[in-house]
Amino acid sequence: MMSARRDSAKITPKEPRDKPRGSLQAFPNQPESKVVDKVVVSAAEAVNGIVDGSSLAVGGFGLCGVPSVLIAELHHSGVTDLEAVSNNCGVDDWGLGILLKDRRIRRMVSSYVGENKEFERQFLSGELEVELTPQGTLAEKLRAGGAGIPAFFTATGVGTQIADGGVPWRHAPDGSIAKSSPAKETREMDWHGKKLTFVLEHAITTDFALVRAWKGDRHGNLVFRQSARNFNPLAAMAGRVTIAEVEHLVEPGEIDADAVHLPGIYVQRVLALTPEQAHDKHIEHRTVQPRTNAMNGAAQ
């Protein structure tokens, strides 16, 4: 489990809102509630406190839902020696790939890394330590960290090097394996009337989390859109200080409570994107057909 740092910037609450309405008025000695406005004015303020050696949980899947503005600001700040937890590491010129390219990331915990050639080069040359983790297990490790569950048992990985140990974590410059994963605890349990073996996986918590949301309010309540939801809520739960860049900032109360994907209790800072930033989205592989062919195919 990654240790949570205590050197992050403190967020000071703004002025309290008007007196609460309704039944609370019947209790004159009831203290007024203080609601924190979590909006920051710049990307630099948003990433303030992220220092060399910090651990980060970063949302996104491929290039979808990636907090690209926050990552770019981190790159601009010069911070280095980072430990990043993310499903993948972007591509060579986008997402976490821009940090990786300049050797800002020391260690990655990831599930899929096949789209980044620089990632492969650094891993095989011994410059980067990588803990490959099954995708579903990675998702649950992040969720467990946010839910206060220190560890859990899963059937995923039983009978493989994930459970038995020996997955290469770091190579030596000559290509040999310098560090590999340790063996994990396994246990037999009754499951649907059968004795099955499960492996113990530990939760992940990080110093900071960087996520991207489609909509958010000043209290940090977030709504994600379609595929961009992916690992973002899970990463947000795992971070001690969670920073969200949002495409559309709205006032408190404009998001229906039933529509909230991630409650504001998990979010400490909100950065409103400009329209240009919100529309700057990349894809890995364009697979569309020419319009004429697509129309002919539909007619058939």
Regions flagged by a language model, labelled:
Residues 13, 17-300:
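Conserved alpha/beta enzyme-core scaffold
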Residues 2-3, 296:
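Position-driven detector of the extreme protein N-terminus
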